[in-house]
Amino acid sequence: LGGDGTLIQASRDLISLELPMMGINMGHLGYLTQVSGEEFMDPVLDALLNDSFTLEKRMMLEGSVVGAQKTVKGIALNEIVLTRQDVLQMLHFQVYLNDTFFNEYMADGIIAATPTGSTAYNLSAGGPIVAPGAQLMLLTPICSHSISARSIVLSPEDRISIRLVKWSGGKSYSAVFDGDQVFPLHYGEKLEICRAPKYTTLIQLKNVSFLENIRQKMNRI
């Protein structure tokens, strides 16, 4: 019971149990939820009892902040974001794909998103919308100081490594998982991102297509 944020948090908290989940929207948008709390619930309960539903696996991301002394890990259903904490200066960082240098950015940060997360922060930053059942990763710079910096679509087998290039004392940077789990990132450390070994499984009750869901819910914003 709740909004998209509640469902995202539950997906991380319950990942080891691999339980199917269904969201009942009590929040604002409810893009990930199946029904609204205002709807009559008897048909929903009947569908669950009669196995009149499908299960949809949603890819997740695993991120690691790798330092000289320790490594901390987290998982995300929507996205992992490299961002600043308390300054307005741009970040200067490099991105490596599968240990090969890809690009260097001056930007407010960068988003690594799943197909589920393609309609969240990634969309606001100009990234593409992707069907939620797809198996891929999106990498979208945030307000890059370049006319050529664009989102890229990656294989789910790719490994992303993000490294800070320039550091000035007093700056604080963070790796943020799904908007609420925050790990500080310091110069000399790197943020490594790959597909998580487990999935979130969502119960799908209604025969509503992905595009219809986009049309109905995104037009409200």
Per-segment meaning from a language model:
Residues 3-6, 29, 116-118:
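Short glycine-rich anion-binding loops that position phosphate/pyrophosphate groups of nucleotides
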Residues 3, 25, 80, 179:
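A residue-level signal for conserved active-site and pocket-lining positions in enzyme catalytic cores
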Residues 68, 82, 87, 98-101, ...:
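ATP/nucleoside-binding phosphotransfer catalytic cores, i.e., glycine-rich phosphate-binding loops
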Residues 95, 117, 175:
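Short aromatic-centered micro-motifs
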Residues 103-107, 111-148:
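Gly/Ser/Thr-rich active-site loops/lids in small-molecule metabolic enzymes
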Residues 9, 14-24:
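Gly/Ser-rich helix-loop-strand patches that form or flank binding pockets
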Residues 28-108:
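Catalytic core of DAGKc-family lipid kinases
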